[in-house]
């Protein structure tokens, strides 16, 4: 039976150190990195059972653990040279960092939520703050206040018509993540829920072309920025409905322009 081997560039070790570093740097691609924080109570010891009545567990015994289903970058698992180049070299433009360990150390309601002996305290996630997108999906964004200022690209999943999202989450985005450059919102009920959202809501002050809406994976995972999505949905509305029926459903200035075009066309016939 034929065997398959991975191509190997044997002269690579003989290249100059600078050239090898540049090659490692060129292997770096943007990733979407899933990050979440889970809270649990540790098992109660016998001494605690004797000293604490049932149902009166202290808040400061809660443990916050960092979780991610995203594997570490392959380059960092390749060899020592690649790992050192992409994490410590001063001339490499896109460096990976041990990130987000402070999320497990955040205090909650005035109590320290990590016990000193908890081994989970040392957990971290490799993240490139210049390229990677942090994907928090349905997690409360306030869990990320300790690191929000570092985040440039955010992905989350929400029901856009949900009252909590409209009144609270939208306002919180800019407060928790003040330095965002792009945001990716997975619309739980479908991408068309994003139609004209940037006209009504302020997503951390981002321009509409930097606000992306997505279908969930089970609906196809289609992604479009706000400008393109609005244009697509508007085109569909106009094709499927009479202009009279569209009044109030599309931007007023667009509706008036279309009505003028229709009137001019009728007069020219």
Mark where each language-model region is.
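Short, surface-exposed structural microsegments at secondary-structure boundaries
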Residues: 1-137
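Eukaryotic C-terminal
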Residues: 2-4, 89, 104-116, 120-122, ...
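Alpha-helical scaffolding within the catalytic cores
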Residues: 139-142
């Amino acid at each position: 039976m034929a065997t398959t081997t991975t191509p190997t560039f044997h002269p690579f070790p003989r290249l100059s150190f600078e050239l090898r570093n540049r090659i490692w740097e060129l292997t770096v691609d943007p990733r979407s990195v899933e990050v979440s924080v889970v809270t649990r109570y540790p098992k109660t010891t016998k001494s605690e059972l004797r000293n604490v009545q049932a149902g009166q567990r202290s808040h400061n015994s809660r443990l916050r653990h960092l979780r991610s289903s995203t594997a570490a970058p392959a380059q960092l698992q390749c060899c020592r040279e690649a790992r050192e180049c992409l994490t410590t070299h001063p001339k490499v433009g896109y460096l990976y960092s041990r990130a987000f360990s402070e999320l497990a150390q955040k205090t909650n309601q005035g109590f320290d939520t990590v016990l000193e002996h908890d081994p989970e305290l040392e957990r971290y996630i490799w993240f490139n703050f210049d390229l990677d997108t942090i994907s928090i999906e349905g997690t409360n964004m306030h869990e990320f206040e300790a690191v929000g200022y570092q985040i440039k690209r955010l992905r989350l999943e929400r029901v856009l018509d949900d009252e909590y999202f409209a009144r609270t989450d939208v306002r919180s985005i800019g407060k928790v993540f003040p330095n965002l450059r792009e945001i990716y919102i997975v619309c739980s009920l479908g991408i068309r829920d994003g139609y004209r959202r940037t006209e009504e809501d302020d997503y951390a002050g981002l321009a509409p072309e930097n606000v992306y809406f997505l279908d969930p994976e089970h609906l196809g995972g289609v992604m479009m920025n706000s400008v393109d999505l609005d244009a697509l949905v508007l085109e569909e509305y106009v094709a499927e409905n009479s202009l009279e029926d569209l009044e109030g459903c599309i931007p007023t200035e667009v509706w008036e322009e279309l009505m003028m075009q229709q009137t001019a066309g009728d007069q020219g016939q």
